[in-house]
Amino acid sequence: MEISSKKGIVSKAPYELFMLFTDMRNFVAMLPEDKKEGVEADYDWIHAQVQGFNIGVKVTERVPYSKICYADDGAPFKFGVALHFNPSFDPYKTEFQIVVDADLNFMMKAILGGKIKDALDKVVDSLVDMSEGRMPEGIDPSMFGK
């Protein structure tokens, strides 16, 4: 099942966004302190214990400044995620999109399909907002001051 987010114009150049998402340790650095326990990462992978499940994600492909692909690495189901960093009309902006390919059974597709799309769209909207200096609702700005 392939699910694509909407496209958003992020106020950062493609290379800036690419560099943020290429190193999995950056994801840990963005977590609040109380969520970092049980999370381990290096440049190519991240593993965490979430509600009793071991979940891992690894980088499978890096196309400099245009695409990064991730895949499950010990998750309860198979999935892949592709982040697309396309040049925009402005060299200091990026058209950003997330595409998820998840191996879900019929029931899980029915339950989660729309929720995954909504979550992906929210991530894109939040990234756009943050790139323009607006902190998305529910995000604590102090998380980014460290």
Feature locations, PLM:
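Soluble, non-transmembrane catalytic domains of enzymes that act on hydrophobic metabolites at membranes
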Residues: M1-E2, K7, A75-A82, P141-K146
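Hydrophobic ligand-binding cavity/cleft-lining segments
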Residues: M1-E40, K146
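Intrinsic-disorder/low-complexity, polar/charged segments enriched in Ser/Thr/Lys/Arg/Asp/Glu/Gln
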Residues: E2-K7, W45, N54, K67, ...
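Generic structural detector for well-ordered beta-strands
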Residues: K7-S11, K58, H84
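Hydrophobic pocket/interface hotspot
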Residues: L17-F21, F27, V59, Y70, ...
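Glycine-rich portal/gate segments that line the openings of hydrophobic small-molecule binding cavities
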Residues: V28-A29, G38-P76, G145-K146
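Beta-strand/loop substructures that line and gate deep hydrophobic ligand-binding cavities in soluble
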Residues: A75-D125, D129
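Short, highly charged C-terminal tails/helix-capping segments
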Residues: D125-K146
